[in-house]
Amino acid sequence: MTCWLRGVTATFGRPAEWPGYLSHLCGRSAAMDLGPMRKSYRGDREAFEETHLTSLDPVKQFAAWFEEAVQCPDIGEANAMCLATCTRDGKPSARMLLLKGFGKDGFRFFTNFESRKGKELDSNPFASLVFYWEPLNRQVRVEGPVKKLPEEEAECYFHSRPKSSQIGAVVSHQSSVIPDREYLRKKNEELEQLYQDQEVPKPKSWGGYVLYPQVMEFWQGQTNRLHDRIVFRRGLPTGDSPLGPMTHRGEEDWLYERLAP
């Protein structure tokens, strides 16, 4: 592997040398050019055409791609996703978490309402999800409004989790500052003893959300960077309103188009 830095060319005989050299450079505050880091995706014969859509309902199309991701032995957590939220004054934040269900009504996930994402969703109830399945060269982006799930549903899911995870949710006042990890260990041990023979109560600050999709984009990578992008959006045109020549009707109120990469 060869990498170019400002004024420096470094060649590595073994991939294992790369992380160590990166650490060395970071310690010296070197400016790093990662331009040469590149991988091949799919060829043109494997392009994602409109005729390859499993359904003209994007949630069903997501289900088809999700099933392929689940079956792929190189993907450990097909339901891992990046959740992006934003404050009312436009400061974004993003983090990885797990999708816990999806359907026509939306995409479900659970978290602590007092976390940064919880506070941002409370003040600005819109979000974006991104699923990236690298071995398949595929990505799905979902945008839409978010609302809290009913308390009964949150309660049901909470008690379906392993008891250690339930206790962990009680221990952690997510995003609050703590003295050290030992603090968490002690709190966890105390609660393990307290709830050894009884049910763990769900914290009031813990629950679920559902994101109602208004935009869903399906991306598939191409080696020549002419990536495939097919986007679905809920349409404003109603009835027999004419559509543009490059806009197509999907199922129900969905419209879809191909975007330039």
Curated annotation (Swiss-Prot):
Keywords: Disease variant, Epilepsy, Flavoprotein, FMN, Oxidoreductase, Phosphoprotein, Pyridoxal phosphate, Pyridoxine biosynthesis. The keyword Transcription does not apply. FMN binds at residues 95-98, 110-111, 116-117, 139, 174-175, 219, 229. Binds 1 FMN per subunit. The modification Phosphothreonine is found at residue 238. InterPro entries: Pyridox_Oxase (IPR000659), Pyridox_Oxase_CS (IPR019740), Pyridox_Oxase_N (IPR011576), Pyridoxamine_oxidase_dimer_C (IPR019576), Split_barrel_FMN-bd (IPR012349). Ubiquitous. Expressed in liver, brain, lung, prostate and stomach (at protein level). GO terms for biological process: pyridoxal phosphate biosynthetic process; pyridoxamine metabolic process; pyridoxine biosynthetic process. Pathway: Cofactor metabolism; pyridoxal 5'-phosphate salvage; pyridoxal 5'-phosphate from pyridoxamine 5'-phosphate: step 1/1; Cofactor metabolism; pyridoxal 5'-phosphate salvage; pyridoxal 5'-phosphate from pyridoxine 5'-phosphate: step 1/1. One of its GO terms (molecular function) is protein homodimerization activity. Pyridoxal 5'-phosphate binds at residues 42-45, 100, 157, 161, 165, 225-227. It is an enzyme of class 1 (oxidoreductase). GO terms for cellular component: cytosol; mitochondrion. The modification Phosphoserine is found at residue 241. Its EC number is 1.4.3.5. It comes from the Eukaryota. Its cofactor is FMN. It catalyses: pyridoxine 5'-phosphate + O2 = pyridoxal 5'-phosphate + H2O2; pyridoxamine 5'-phosphate + O2 + H2O = pyridoxal 5'-phosphate + H2O2 + NH4(+). Catalyzes the oxidation of either pyridoxine 5'-phosphate (PNP) or pyridoxamine 5'-phosphate (PMP) into pyridoxal 5'-phosphate (PLP). Homodimer. Belongs to the pyridoxamine 5'-phosphate oxidase family. It is linked to Pyridoxine-5'-phosphate oxidase deficiency: The main feature of neonatal epileptic encephalopathy is the onset within hours of birth of a severe seizure disorder that does not respond to anticonvulsant drugs and can be fatal. Seizures can cease with the administration of PLP, being resistant to treatment with pyridoxine,. PANTHER family: PYRIDOXINE-5'-PHOSPHATE OXIDASE, PYRIDOXINE-5-PHOSPHATE OXIDASE. This is Pyridoxine-5'-phosphate oxidase. It comes from Homo sapiens. The gene is PNPO.
